[in-house]
Each structure stands twice: as structure tokens, then as C-alpha cells.
Amino acid sequence: MSMDVTFLGTGAAYPSPTRGASAVVLRCEGECWLFDCGEGTQTQLMKSQLKAGRITKIFITHLHGDHFFGLPGLLCTISLQSGSVVARQPIEIYGPVGLRDFIWRTMELSHTELVFPYVVHELVPTADQCPVEELREFAHMDETDSSPKGQGRTILLDAEENSYCLVDDEQFVVKAFRLFHRIPSFGFSVVEKKRAGKLNAQKLRDLGVPPGPAYGKLKNGISVVLDNGVTISPQDVLKKPMVGRKVCILGDCSGVVGDGGVKLCFEADLLIHEATLDDSQMDKAREHGHSTPQMAAAFAKLCRAKRLVLTHFSQRYKPTALAREGEADGIAELRKQAEAVLELQEVTLAEDFMVIGIPIKK
């Protein structure tokens, strides 16, 4: 099963000609999950090899404009490109409290009717995720008879696990964890479940299992009885299960809240972490709830992440290929700062339209 990550926007604060606003797509067997949707994400999608109509889930890390102002426009474009009638499952949208009302009000005010259903699941933050003066309560928002009620889940922190369970299906488990930022922010851990090992052809022959339907049953975990009365169990003929992959994507932060993030990101195959400013501006980064390469690398080291990708760069840091003379030194320095913490383990600097494959574990 193929799996890859495409960066649509790798810049902080606003989109620019060299870096789009925050947006990352995790693609698995053609299905696409979008993480953050900054302004201009839909045009970035059009420039990429991805199809907006393949998006089935959207995860918003926090409610700063450079991470979700592109969402209403993207939903409208998907609707316009879908024709008049669409038979599809609802697009599942996950994000902090307030996201449901934002989308609903945007559609109401613009008289927009989407041709597909969508459901918004809201994560309830805790008071320690941001400075106390920045914590907002949404109970004051005016409600009308037509306000969205009962649409999607309201997801509370599992205090024991220190995380939020968002998805748990046949293939994946997705959980969110708390980050510290100027407003409540979240990170997401996507874990592929173990898959049954391949059939051992030699053992099948040795045990006299005839090719055909019996192979399929054994592969699916069902025992079969041969004509001679012998029962063959799946564990008799299956190789070891294939360990699933783990991708972790963090929103804006100057640190994690609690131990949920460390536990969920432990030994991640791919860890995507913001690095808005270089280490010389660490105090400024912390003041604004952001990270530097050293901070990101320290978290990756704590989690024993196999690969660290830095993103969400200040627009002053131009991609190497687009930098003018002298500008490339700044972005290269970010890599050096992170690699110094990770003892020269390779660090990747994300660029718009960069694609990173996550190979199946052997």
C-alpha cells in the first residue's frame, strides 16, 4: 500500500510567491487527507499532482487564518467540480471548537449549498494550551434555530491517554495531542494498523492446501478444513504481520502540553514540525508561540523519530532554488541547527510541492 506526503504550503503567516500558507496532504492508495488549509490551498492543489475530489478527511491544527482561511473556498471548489449530484461519504473535518460554526456561517452568509455532505468534529482544548488571556469561550456566539446542532462529535481529552481519539477504522488510528501556542493548537498522529503477513507458499504446499478460495480465507484470518479433515489455521501459513507506519504532523507550537505528544510521536517514521525562526531568535519564537530548529529537533530526539521534516518557515527564508544570492544561507542554517541536535541525522527542509514517500516496513 503506497503512502506519501505532499507539502502544498510551507510558509508562515501568509502565502507568498515562494511559499504557500500551511497545507500538507497525506495520500494512501489514492485517498487524500488534508492537514491545514491556509489561504490559497486550492490553487496549490491545482498545481500539484493531487485531486481535490480525492480529499475525504481534513484536519485543522488551530484557528489562525494561515491554517484554515482556505477551507471554505476549497469546499466550494470541490462542490463546483463535482457536478449536480454526488453520491459520496461525507467529508470528515476535525479541528478546534469554533470550526463548525465558522464553516456553517461562511456557507450561510455566501448562500452556498454544497452538493456533498460534510461533518465537523470539534476538539475541546484545555486551559493550559495557550496564555490565559488568549483563551476564548464560544458560548457567547449567537445561536439561531438553523445553527448546526448535533453535527459531528464534540471530542474531549482522554485524561488517561492524554490525547483525543479521532479515527479508529480497519486501517488507521488517528489521535490528536495538545500543543502550546498563542491559541489552542493540536498535533496529529496517524498510525497504520498492522497488516496480516503474506502467505508462505512453501508451507501451503507442504501442508497440502490447494490453491483457490482457501488461500483467501487464510489470508483473511479464517481457518480452513482440508478434504482429509486436517484443520489449517492462519498462523500455520502466514508470515509475520507487517508493522504499520506512523506519520505525525504538528501545528504551530512552542512546546507540547502533557506527555501525550511524546507518546504518540514515539518512533514516528515521519515527524513534521514547524521551525518558524532560526535559533538566534528563540526568545522571539517562544514569545509568539513558535519553534526554532533546535526546539523541533529536541522534540524529534525525545521521540526517537526516524525522520524530521521542518516546515512553516518565516517568509524571509526562501527555498534554496528560488533564493537570490546570499538568501540560501539562511534556510541552510536552519538545517544545520537541527542536525547539530540530532547528531548529524539528516533533516529535511520542506518546500512547496515536495513529495516524501513512506515505504512499507519490512
Swiss-Prot record:
Its main location: cytoplasm. Transmembrane segments: none annotated. It is found in: Cytoplasm, Cytosol; Nucleus. Zn(2+) 2 binds at residues 66-67, 252, 312. It catalyses: Endonucleolytic cleavage of RNA, removing extra 3' nucleotides from tRNA precursor, generating 3' termini of tRNAs. A 3'-hydroxy group is left at the tRNA terminus and a 5'-phosphoryl group is left at the trailer molecule. Keywords: Cytoplasm, Endonuclease, Hydrolase, Metal-binding, Nuclease, Nucleus, tRNA processing, Zinc. Its cofactor is Zn(2+). InterPro entries: Metallo-B-lactamas, RibonucZ/Hydroxyglut_hydro, RNase_Z/BN. Its EC number is 3.1.26.11. It is an enzyme of class 3 (hydrolase). NCBIfam families: PRK00055.1-3, RNase_Z. This is Zinc phosphodiesterase ELAC protein 1. It comes from Mus musculus (Mouse).
